[in-house]
Structures are given as structure tokens and as C-alpha cells.
Amino acid sequence: MMQGNKKCTDGFSDTSSIGSVLDEADREVSNLTDRAFRSLCISEDTSFHDSDLALSPDVTSQVSGTFHQETVGHANRKSGIWSQLPSQGTEHSGWAATFQQQPKYVQGEEKYPKTSPLPTPVQRRLEVPISGLRSSSKPISKVSSLIRSFDRTETQSCDSRPPPSKPPALKNPPKFAHPPESGVNFCFDSAFLTVRRVPAEVSNTHQGSHQSGRAPGEQESPKNPEIASHSSDSLLRTPDHVAGSFEPRYPSPPLKPATAEPGRGKEWIPRRTFLHSENSAFESWDTHQPKLRERKDIAETTPESKAPKHYEDMPLLKEPYPAESKGSPYQARANCAQEENRSPSGSQSTSGAWGARDPGSQLFPVEGNASQIDPQVKRSKAPWRKPKTGKGGTDGPPDALEDKKQPNRRGLPLYSKLNPQGQLPENGVLDMPEESNDHYNPPFNISKLLTPIISTKHVLETSDTQPVEISPSPPGQLNGYQEKESSEAQSRDSYKSKAPSLLFNLKDVRKRVKSTYSPLPLLKGFDEKTRGKLDSKQEPLSNGVTLPDGLEENPPTELLPDNVPGVLHSSTQKDPAINSRESFAVSHPTFSSPSASSQTHFCVNGEAAESNSNEKEEANGESELDPSKGGGHPDCRENLPRKHLSLKLFNRESEMGPAMAEMKPHQLENGLSRSVSQETETERETGFQSLPLNQKFSPGPLSPEEEDVFYSDSQSDFTPCRQTKAKFSTSSSDQSFASFEDQQKVCFTEGPQEDRKSHVSAGDKQRDETAVEKEESQQCASRNEHRGVDEQRQEEIQRKAQGVSGGRPRKASAEDLSARGSWMGADKDTAHTHAKDPTPLPASTNKHRLFPIKDNTLRATPVIKPIILPLLRTVSSEDSLSSGHQENELPKQLWGEDAGGLSASESQEMPNTPLSNNDVPGTQHRCMVCEDVQEDPVHTAAQDETSQQTRKGSFSFLPPVEEENRMKPSPDTAGEGLAQEKSKSADLGKLGVPQRIPTIALLPDDLEDSPPSLPQHTYWEEQGFKGHFLSAPRAGPSGRRLVPSEAETSPNPSSLGESSTCSPAASSIWEEASQAAGEHWQRQEPPGPNPWASPGPTGLTRREDMTHGLTWEAEGSDPSDFRALSPRGILLADAAEKPEPPALLEKAAGKPPAVPPKTEKALRRAKKLASKRRKSDQLLEKHTEAWEGKSFTEDTQGTERRPVSPGKGPRPRFPAIRSLPPPTHRHSVSCGWEPTGRRPWGPQSLTPLPPYPATQKVLQDPQSGQYFVFDVPLQVKIKTFYDPETGKYVKVSVPSSEEASSEPPLQDALAAPYLLYPGFRPVPVTSVMPLRCSSQLAAPTFLRQGSGHRPQSSQGSRLQPPPERLGESTQHASGQCPRGPSHSPEKESAEAPRLSIISTDDLEDFATEGVS
């Protein structure tokens, strides 16, 4: 570092002298010349190397010099590794040595001793030019040397090029060379830059440049930790850096100088501009355009050939294409490149993830961008420039864009190199073809080099400049803002979202290019999609869907095409995108095997795949959308789906971004993440047109969001390529399924869903999605259930609703779930459906939908969304658990309804109940399946759950609940019956269970049949756990529905309120149910089935179906089993769903393990919520009874910020719920819940609950018989109540005497909502309550709780619960029930203590981390 610093000073002075010596004109000329020469050199593989090397340090210096002199030192240290790595391969060692040496020499000759391997003949050769350039050509050599290089560009690349490049290198290297290690880093940056320019090298040296590529790539790999930081900046991997360094650098050329020296930055800017806009560069493009087209066409024709040929271009396609090694090759190759990056980048999840992601995925995608976008850009270099110019606000950004392009040029070519490095192992196979193609590809590599810039423009600019650049940027920016506001998780997403924006620009170009170069089907698909997006998309999707529905692996295969259209849609975010998607749906067969692999990868990688897929697909999708629109159809499709998924995922993640927690649920579950991807896909289809900035806007949020989206960002890092594929496949599969279903339903739901999705697409897309998508869920509940998972499952539910109608989709959904077996597979299927559904839906309605929903969800989105999303993520993560996805749906619904999606959430829930008919019809009337969808929204939640359950294998218990709950409404909704029965069955089983939990006729039953009721109640609590997440939304709808039909649903609402007290209507239901008394529920339970028909009664019926089911389950083991089956009645249900409730609990209570708050916003929210919780607890302690009504109602709202409540509130509730819920909750529920807690809490909860129905659970104090509304998140010993007056969260310790009486039930509700709620199982509460605190603290605890206690709750609820609950009931009911407060304290003392210990601290921590 010392010599490096010296040199840095030297270099600075050098750069300064260069700056002064070379006047602006000269510098610009030299830059332009350099770029022109580089472009030509890229065209001529040979002359580019030295220039690349020399220039690479320059660019590196600019990029990394300012940012990473330290890092450069680090990288330099690792540069030794790099230099050593080059030695690993003969060519690579030579090439890498050359690269390293030149940069190192650029840094200084001192560097050579440090990296001894560097001084190789090539290196020395480079050295000499560098030295000469540095010494003699500093001012002149820039222009002179570049001119010289141009003269020799085509003849001699190294000698003439190094001098021209050397001065830039000198400019930078002196500064950069200051640390020898820095120099190495720059050398690596050089490698990056060289890679950027290396496309020529990669062309030359893909034969021999793989040495260089590998060396740089490996240097990058060693350097990746830093490179993740600074090289990330240099690299396309710059997502991190894009957020940090490239953001400034990319957004404006001036920032580039800011990043590096002004002169350098300027240099680079002109260079990049020159490369992209200058004639020389364009000449290179044009010169190689024919070749590119040929190669592109060849790539289209022969994906394998294309992969080798477009090694950089096709790697993505190639990797996906090798279906056999799709997971492996793409990942193996990507892993080689990516894991090298990842391993080093492990420290930098984002950067590393992007580096890891990008190296392989974006290596391919970016290289794909380079090659694939390049072909288009080359073909339409003018068009590219036109879009650049015609990108609206891209004129300023074009420079920045080119800055981005250039950094990406370095970065992407480095990815090319990284690809060589990482993929060289694989490319050993590909290498030969690649090398041949690279020999042939040099021109293409130039395009690649340029394209990586363009691709960088997509990806990097997507991050920073894209919002400005992209024509759709304004609407997208709105979305971007919403999404940015939605989450910092969109920091990364911004790249991806900008990729869509860029894609819009590129899409304009690509549309032209596609019209010119791409197969007619694409254009056809474009037009088709444009004019008949619904029908056309449905048809192609149907084609793809049928297979996905029928096939497990085929759906991915077929779905990939669907996804491809979706991706193309994302790419061509305008109507052409729809056509493209349609066309891709038609052309999907090409991607069937990659699709399957992609899907698998997605599954394997889950969210990681999502996140990586997003970014990579962003780059890939962009770049490969070019090929997609251009010749590289196969790649385009592969990449396009990726892109689209990326877009969609990130849109969704963007929407989820606002709630990192929501994004975390994405991370939580692939389904969620992929749902995000799908929703994002949809939103990116439709919303990209307006959401380009949504993702562009995600620059800041993107990084957090990706983190949000993937707590498993490392996962992302590790499985970028696979994930990208998975994403493709996921989106495709979802699209296929969704499209298949959508074809039945899409016509109806597409518009509304798109609207909702559009709304969801909004910044608070997740929340909006939950709000509007809840409505959409009402129309297409699948989409609603989880904003991220919702999307998947909504589509799956649509698919299932239509599968019920269309038999197969739902079956296929179940099949997919079964065949995919894993939650991942299931989620994938769901994601497929969702991707598919969103693919058709979002394009048209996503935009307008996007914003309206955002408004709704934005009201409480910032905190709640993050809270819910982590919750959902946790649930999603545990989606493999049967309840995870359903619960995710519910949390999403919760958030949606909480956010502003209360109506939407209730809509979704009400679709479960009457609102399904009321809200959904309105929401879904757009959907032809208004009632079906309306019921479908009911079963969208339910069917989402069912789908999710089905894919989780939890379907087995879903169907019983389906039948028992759904049967009653099923007759009412005869036509919808099938779709609704399954969807509603699922809904009732899932949401229905919650509603049943709310419908816990147990109260009357408990009043009379304490033990049976208790099992029932326990059951409901059980179910309520997951049901509270599910039932909270259900409560929301029930509340909503029941609020409309409060009197009639009042008994059911009471039961609903019990489980879904969180639901606003549930509150009123509680109120009225309290008035109606516990038995009134059951009395009105019969009316319930009738109300099923009517919106008002529907909720009641559903609730009462639930109540009946509860009674069945409570009174009868089989009904209970069904109940438990759906919620967690059966051990299977418990096993399958228990994990889900724990996931839910984890999410709801702590959402900590799976979803720590990754963004400052999330942390702040979590802390804020925690403080609010404390305040709320204190307040509630004071105003236990009074506040519980209001606070709890509001606590539901607060519970929306559930993590806070879970952190604090759940703790008290755990103790209370434990003892109280088993006997008290059950007994109390049946005893005094009607007048005491129900009325006060019902009305009070009613008022606050409507906003946060999903998070509230009504628990009864066994002693007082009062029912308290507990925030689902508040499952800790401390109950967090929301003070409606103060708007603060009051944390009430369950032990409080008053609280014990009123709060403990609330805490039970909180615990039950979290853990208890999975079934409102008092016994599980008893058993689960202690676990609950732990479970809430961590998913394992929840899982333990869910598994150990939830079975008790399910079985104990219906079988054991009578004894256990009765026993506990007896011990607690007799012991504590009489003394409700004492009961609560007792529980707190006995059970709560560990709950409080674990729950309070852990949950709070988790809430702080994951709730916000």
C-alpha cells in the first residue's frame, strides 16, 4: 500500500498533469480515440489487450481508485492470487499475468515484486508500453497512443494499444498504482475493465484470454470481497457499488470523476460515450454487427453453439440450455465464476451476491447483454443510441449510462473474464467452441464489450441512471419511488428495476431490432400481446401452462417460455413486451429444458435465486432481451424469462422493498420471492412500462430489497445463475400455470389482477399488492395471498380456482406441489402460476393498479410492510411447511389489509367471506370469474393456501377443511363451488381455518362444551395461528364482510374476531358476536352457510363453516381433524402446517430468524415498533381493558408492525395464551367472551381492528370471559396493544392483573395469532405458549412450538386439547381461569418466563431485525 500510495499520489499528479497537459478537448479526443480504438481493437481482438489492460487500470482507477484504494490494496493482495491464478492456466496465466502486470505496472513497477508472477513476457511487454506511455505519453500518448493504437488496433493490439490505453492507465494507475495492491486491484479492475474491453480480449483470449479472463476473473474472485465492494463498482457486479460508487459514478459522468479523478472520470465518460456513441465504437459495432447477427442467429439456432460462440453472450443461454447442467453448469460455471466471486464476496452479500450473481449469471447475462444486447445494439447501435438519446432523460444519463456501460464494460467483460475464469472450467468444454467462436467472436466481443456497457446501462444504469434514462422511467420512477419507498431492498432492485427501464429503452431498440432481427413469432407475440395480451398471452401461456399443469418438470419447461414472454414483456415493458412474452410463451418449447432447470434452480435457490435472478435476469433479461428481440431467441427466452422474472421479482421485491420484511418473506419463501418475481413480473410486464423506474427507483432499495428479498442473499450469491434459471422457470412455470388458469380466468382476472398488480407494483407494491391485490386476490386471491407469495399463490389459486373449474390447473398445482414435492417446487409452481398469471395480467392493469394499491398500502406500509414481509418471508421460508405459504399469504394479506390493503386484505379475506362476493366482485368483477374469483379470492387466500399447502403437501388437510368449510359455502357458490371449494376450502382450510378460528363457534361451544369447544377453539387457535395470519386476513375479510353483515355475521364474526380479531370486521364481529354471545355464533352459524351466498352472510357462513368446522373439530375429532387438517388439526397438518405456523409465528412474532431487518428503515421500524410495543405494553398495562379494545384493535394495526408487537406483545401473550388459551381462551371464549371481551374488544377491536385485522387475534380471558384482541405479531409475553388514540403501541405484560384477564387472552391471541393462532389452540397455547415465545423468537422455536405444541393444539385441540386443554384448562381454567389475571401471570411465571425471556428479547431483537 505504501508504494501504492506513493504511486497513487504519483498517479494523481500524473492524472492531474495529464488533465492539465491534455486539455479538455485533448482529453476528450483521447478518450474518444481511446474508446474508438478500443472499439476497433475489440473488433480486432489483438490490439485491445494492452489497451484494455492499460485502460482497465484507468477505468479501474476511476471506478476503484477513489472507491477502493484500500480495497484495491486488498485486491492487490489478492492480485497475487490473481497473478497466481493466471499461472494456473497456461494461456490464462500468461494473459492474467499480462493483465495483472500491465495494471500492476500501471500501478508501478514496484508492484511486480509484490506480484512476482506478473512480470511475464506479456506483462513486461505491457509494462514497456505502460512505462513508455506513462513516462512519455501521459499527455500525448493518450491521443497519440490511442491514435497509434487505432493505427495498430487492427494490426497490433498489444503494443499500439497499450500506449493509448497506457496513458489512461497511467492517468488512473498512478493514482491507482499508488498502492501496489491497489494497483493489483486496479489490475483486477483492469481485468474488469479489460474484461469490459476484454470482449475483444475475451474474443482473442477467450482462446487465450480465458487465461486473462480466468486470471481477471480469479483475481476478481480473490479480490471479490473487495471487488464486491469496489470491483463490484467496477464490475457489473456493481449492484453494491452501483448503490454506492456506481450510483454516483453512473448517474452522472461527473460522478465518475467523483469516483475517480475528474479527468479520469471525464475520460471514462467520453470513452464510454465514445464507445457507445462515437463512430469508432459504432463502427466496431456495425463492423461486427453482421457477425453479431450471424452469431446471434447462430446462437438462436444453436444455443450450444451460441453459448460457445456467444460465450459471453450466450453463457446465460448456454448455461440454461444445458438443462442437464442447468443447475450445475449454469451454477457450476456460474459457481466457478460466481463462487469465486461469492467466496470472496461472501463478505459482501450484496456486492458479493451481485458479483457472485453477476459473475456467473450476469457474467452470462451481462455477457449475454454484451453479446445479446450487443447484437441488437450492434444491429441497432443507432437504435441503441437512439433509445439512449430517446430515453427521455437519458441524455445526461447517457453519459452516465455510458459510464455505467463502461464500468459494466469493465465489469461485464470482466464477467466475461470472470465467466472465463469461473466458467472456464465449464468453458473448458465451452471454451473450445467459445474460443473458436471467440476467435470468430472478437467482433461480437466488441459488441459484447459495448453491450456490457449497454448491459451495464441496463443493469448498472438500471441501478442509477436508468430511472433517468428510461422512457418508462417516469411511470417506472413513480413505481420506483413507490418501490424505493417500499424498500431499500430495491437498492439492488434498482439495478433490476432499472434494467427494466433500460429494457424499455432497449425494448424500443429491441423492438426495432426484434422487428428486424428476431423471429417473427416474437414480433408476432409482441403484437399479439399488445393487442391480445390477455388472450394471446393466455394462449401461449396456455400452451406452456398445460404442460406445467400436467407436468412437474414440464411446467418449468413450458413455463419458461411463458416466462420468456413475461421476461420479454419485462424487456419490452411496453406492449411489445406483452407480445414478446406472448411470443415467448409460444416459443417456450426452446426453453423447456432450461426452464425446468431454471425452475429447479429457482426452487433450489429459492429467493436467492429470485434475487440473483432478478439482478442477473435484469442484466440477462436486458441483454438477452436484446437477443430475444434480436437473433438470440433461445437465449432471449431464457434470459428474457430471467429478465422478466428479474423484473417481476424485483418489482415485487421493489414493492416488497418498502417492507423489507415483505421482501424477507420473499426471501423466506421462494414462492414469496418468486411471487415477487412473478408479481414483479406482472408488474414488470405491465408495471415495467410504468415501473421501469420502479426497479430503477430501486437503486437504493434494491440492495436492501435484494437482501430483503433474500436474507439468503448469499444464497443469491451462491445460486445466481441457478436462481436466475429458477426464476425463469419459476416465472415461466407460474406464467404457464397462471396463464393456463388465467386463460380460464385471466380474461376475467387479468385486468383486475393486472390492476391490482399494477397497484401492487407501486412502490408499496407488496402492501399495495396486499391491498389491491387482496382485491385482486378477491378476484385472484392467489395473487393476493402473499404479495410475493400472494402473487404466486394467487396465480396458483387462480390456477387452482380455475383448476377447480379447469380441474387440471389446480390439480397441476397440487401436482406441481406434490411433484415439485418441496415447498420450493410448490412455490415454484405457484411462482409459475403467478409468473404466468402476472405475465398476462400485469402488463395492462399493473400500472394503474400499481399506484392505487400503493396508496392503500402506503398508509402503514413502511413499518407494516417490512414487518409483514419478514413475517411472510419467514412464512415463505417455511413455506415448505404447509402453512408457511398460506401464512405468508395471510401476513401479506395482513400487511395488505393492514397497509391500506385492509380493504384489500379484507377484500381478500372477505373474498373468503362475504367480502369475497362484495369486494371480490367489485375487485373481481373485472375478472369474469367474479364470484369464482370472489370466492376465488377467498380461496385465493385459501386456495393460495391450498395451493401452497398442496405444494407443501399440506393440501391433504386442506381438502378436508375445504370440504367441511367449503362444502357449506360450496353449495352456495355452486358454480364457483369447485374452484371456490378448493380455493375456499384452501381458504377455509387456510384462511377459512382462520375464519373458522374466528368463527370459533367454540365460544358458544366452549361455553357449553368447554372440552370439545376447547379442542375446537384450540383447533381454531391452532388454525388461528396460521389462520391468524391466514385468518387475520380472513378476519379482515370476515371483519370486512362481517362488518358489512355485522349483525348476521356477528356470531361468526365473533368467532372470526376470536381468531381474526385482528380483522377490522372481526372486531365488529367480535363486538356483535359478543352481543350475540358465544352461542349466538353457533346459532348464527347455520345462517352462516346461507350468508355464504350473500357477501355479508358469506363471511358468516364461511366463519360459521369455520365455526361448524370448529365445532366439528372441537366436538368431533374428525371435524377437528379436518379443522386441524386445514389449519393444523392432523399431525400431518401439524407437521406440515406446524412448521408454517412457526414460520408464521416466526414472522409474526419475531420474524427474526428468517427475516432480520436488513435495511436501516426496517431496523428503525423495528426499533420504533419495539419502543411502541413497550409503550403499548405500558399503556395497556394501564389501560388493559379499555386499551385492549382500542389498542388491540389498533394493535392489529400495530401488529401490522407485528414484529414490534411480537417482540414485546407476544411475550406476555405467550404466557397468557399458554395457560389462558387452552382453558381460558377456549373456556373464556365460550364463557365470557361474548359480553365481556367480545363486546368491549369487539367494538374496540372493531374500530382499530379494521386497519389491522390480520394481526389481531381475539383471545378470551378464562376468568373474565372477556375476549381480547391480540395482535398476531404480539405473541410474546408482553402484549403489545395499539393505542388508537395515541397511535402508539402499548406493550402490556400478560402478567398484568387486568391484562391477565383481558390481555392474556389477547396475548393468547397474539400467541395464537403467532403460534396459538395457528389454531387458536388453547392447549397448544398451553404447550405452545412457552414454545411460542421461543418460536416467535426463532423459527426453530416456532417450529418446535408448531410441531410439538401445534400437534397438541391440533390433536390436543381436538383430541388431546380436551384433556390437555381441559387439563390445562382445568389447571389454568380452574386455576387461572378463575383468576384470569393470575392465570396470565401464572402462565407468565411458569410458561411466560421463558416466553418472555426468549420472546421479549429475541422477539424484540428479531422484530427489530426482521419485523421492520
From Swiss-Prot:
Biased composition (Pro residues): 161-171
Keyword Amino-acid biosynthesis attributed: no
Acidic residues composition bias: residue spans: 1401-1412
Sites bearing Phosphothreonine, chain numbering: T120
Tissue: Expressed in the heart and skeletal muscle (at protein level).
Modified residues annotated as Phosphoserine in this record: S328, S473, S813
Keyword Phosphoprotein: yes
Compositional bias annotation for Basic and acidic residues: 285-299, 306-316, 482-496, 525-538, 632-641, 753-799, 826-837, 1176-1203
Biased composition (Basic residues): 378-389, 1164-1175
Region of interest (Disordered), residue spans: 106-177, 202-443, 460-500, 517-848, 877-923, 935-1255, 1344-1412
UniProt KW keywords: Cytoplasm, Phosphoprotein
Function according to Swiss-Prot or TrEMBL: Plays an important role in cardiomyocyte hypertrophy via activation of the calcineurin/NFAT signaling pathway.
PANTHER family: CARDIAC-ENRICHED FHL2-INTERACTING PROTEIN, CARDIAC-ENRICHED FHL2-INTERACTING PROTEIN-RELATED
Protein name per the record: Cardiac-enriched FHL2-interacting protein
UniProt gene name: CEFIP
